């Protein structure tokens, strides 16, 4: 049987209409699964004649090229690398209209092309890991927030609460408990898949952090093990350890697959990978992950707990978004959830988006009534209030540079306020790992003094960022700036 080679992948790409025609490239055990922009561009007869191609299946929106066991994953990895590593020279269309969507997309893509460093590519994979989970984070957080509101208004202090309401509150809270009880497994699956391994192997490795190793424990699922060949097991590190195990596990799996005969790949590759990575996880990753987890928690709790550190974090967050490395904060969110019971970093970083809103409003006020800038701001300001900041960043402030800087100043002012309140003894945070960053986040806020105090502090921080971003832009962000 023909081996998967670079020339073979290039032949397939040419036959399916080029890289520009590929939306998504994935695989199952035997098939290269492609989602194409236009199936009509694919030359089916040519594909079938390529050496190593065993067949072609078209199902729903997928174009499936049968390559056989042990080959499909290699082909998918090579094709993805080929598509990422080279620029697509296909002709691009240019629209005459310069609405917000066009401008934002253009500037965003220019920046993305510059993000080629290994560190940026590594951090960008965090989006692949966590983005599919965000709807669940938000849903569970909103349900928990509304349940907590009902609890504080109708249940606490009530000697005879309504039984149905109590059941409803417990029902609304159970989703959050379920999510966080087994979240590590979901992350392990996504992480190993994002780095080129099999998701199920990552999920199994992540489950080692969820299982219990104390037979006398009254909660959790006992693993049946108390030690690993005499080496004590301490499943610390949680999400940090899971990420390390899944990333290394993906590398081990790919290396094992290189030496595994094709006909044994489906049976033995995962077996060998799990045996190797299980031992590495118990002996090395769990202890290291625990130290990193504790260190990360300590560092950001101290940064969050003082106004200067919070101002710096909020002020620089938009720059991290611009370079695509903001997903690197997500493991910190987990560390803070574990240490504090809520995500105290998220509301600080959310001030950055509020600063953008204030800056955009100042630009709107300064621009002429018939200016295109006003149209762009109108199209992006409502999403900005709701915590969706990319249209403002890439379409309004960043192309004009100065307003982007003054927006960062506005975010820093709000971050300073949140940090000051925390320094005075009232840290606030999100009740879930991740959520919306605008006014929609209000029901998800909590604090040591309860949900109402958390909501009030967050709302005040938003207002401060709006005002500071507006004033900084009004006085310092519009001189020699295109307001047309």
From Swiss-Prot:
Catalytic EC class: transferase
GO molecular function: kinase activity; protein-N(PI)-phosphohistidine-sugar phosphotransferase activity; protein-phosphocysteine-N-acetylmuramate phosphotransferase system transporter activity
Region (Disordered): 83-106
Pfam families attached to this UniProt entry: PTS_EIIB, PTS_EIIC
Catalytic function, reaction form: N-acetyl-beta-D-muramate(out) + N(pros)-phospho-L-histidyl-[protein] = N-acetyl-beta-D-muramate 6-phosphate(in) + L-histidyl-[protein]
GO CC annotation terms, alphabetical: plasma membrane
InterPro entries: Glu_permease_IIB, PTrfase_EIIB_Cys, PTS_EIIC, PTS_EIIC_1, PTS_IIB_1, PTS_Sugar-Specific_Components
PANTHER family to which the protein is assigned, alphabetical: PHOSPHOTRANSFERASE SYSTEM TRANSPORT PROTEIN, PTS SYSTEM N-ACETYLMURAMIC ACID-SPECIFIC EIIBC COMPONENT
Protein name stated in the entry: PTS system N-acetylmuramic acid-specific EIIBC component
Organism encoding this protein: Aliivibrio fischeri (strain ATCC 700601 / ES114)
Gene: murP
């Amino acid at each position: 049987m023909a081996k998967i080679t670079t020339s073979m992948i290039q032949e397939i790409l040419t036959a399916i209409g080029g890289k520009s025609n590929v939306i998504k490239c994935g695989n199952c055990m035997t098939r290269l699964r492609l989602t194409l922009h236009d199936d009509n561009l694919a030359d089916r007869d040519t594909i079938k004649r390529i050496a190593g191609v065993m067949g072609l299946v078209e199902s729903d929106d997928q174009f499936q090229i049968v390559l056989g066991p042990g080959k499909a994953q290699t082909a998918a990895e090579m094709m993805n690398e080929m598509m990422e590593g080279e620029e697509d020279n296909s002709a691009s269309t240019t629209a005459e209209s310069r609405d917000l969507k066009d401008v934002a997309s253009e500037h965003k893509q220019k920046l993305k092309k510059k993000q080629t460093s290994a560190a940026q590519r590594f951090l960008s994979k965090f989006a692949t890991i966590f983005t599919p989970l965000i709807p669940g984070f938000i849903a569970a957080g909103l349900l928990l927030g509304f349940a907590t509101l009902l609890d504080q208004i109708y249940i606490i202090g009530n000697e005879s609460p309504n039984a149905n309401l109590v059941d409803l509150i417990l029902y609304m809270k159970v989703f959050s408990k379920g999510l966080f009880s087994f979240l590590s497994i979901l992350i392990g699956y996504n992480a190993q898949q994002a780095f080129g391994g099999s998701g199920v192997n990552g999920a199994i490795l992540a489950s080692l952090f969820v299982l219990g190793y104390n037979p006398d424990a009254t909660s959790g699922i006992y693993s049946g093990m108390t030690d690993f060949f005499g080496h004590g097991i301490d499943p610390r590190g949680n999400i940090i350890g899971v990420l390390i195990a899944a990333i290394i596990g993906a590398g081990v799996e790919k290396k094992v697959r290189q030496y595994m005969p094709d006909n044994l790949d489906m049976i033995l590759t995962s077996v060998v990978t799990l045996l190797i990575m299980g031992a590495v996880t118990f002996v090395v990753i769990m202890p290291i992950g625990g130290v990193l987890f504790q260190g990360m928690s300590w560092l950001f709790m101290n940064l969050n707990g003082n106004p200067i550190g919070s101002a710096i974090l909020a002020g620089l967050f938009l720059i991290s978004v611009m370079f695509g490395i903001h997903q690197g904060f997500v493991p910190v969110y987990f560390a803070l959830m574990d240490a504090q019971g809520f995500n105290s970093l998220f509301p600080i970083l959310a001030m950055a988006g509020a600063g953008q809103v204030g800056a955009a409003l100042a630009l709107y006020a300064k621009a002429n009534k018939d200016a295109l800038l006003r149209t762009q701001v109108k199209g992006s300001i409502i999403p900005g209030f709701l915590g969706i900041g990319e249209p403002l960043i890439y379409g309004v402030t960043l192309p004009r540079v100065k307003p982007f800087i003054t927006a960062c100043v506005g975010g820093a002012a709000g971050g300073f306020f949140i940090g000051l309140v925390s320094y005075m003894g009232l840290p606030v945070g999100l009740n879930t790992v991740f959520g919306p960053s605008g006014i929609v986040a209000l029901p998800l806020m909590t604090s040591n003094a309860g949900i109402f105090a958390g909501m009030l502090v967050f709302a005040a921080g938003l207002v401060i960022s709006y005002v500071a971003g507006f004033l900084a832009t009004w006085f310092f962000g519009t001189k020699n700036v295109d307001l047309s």
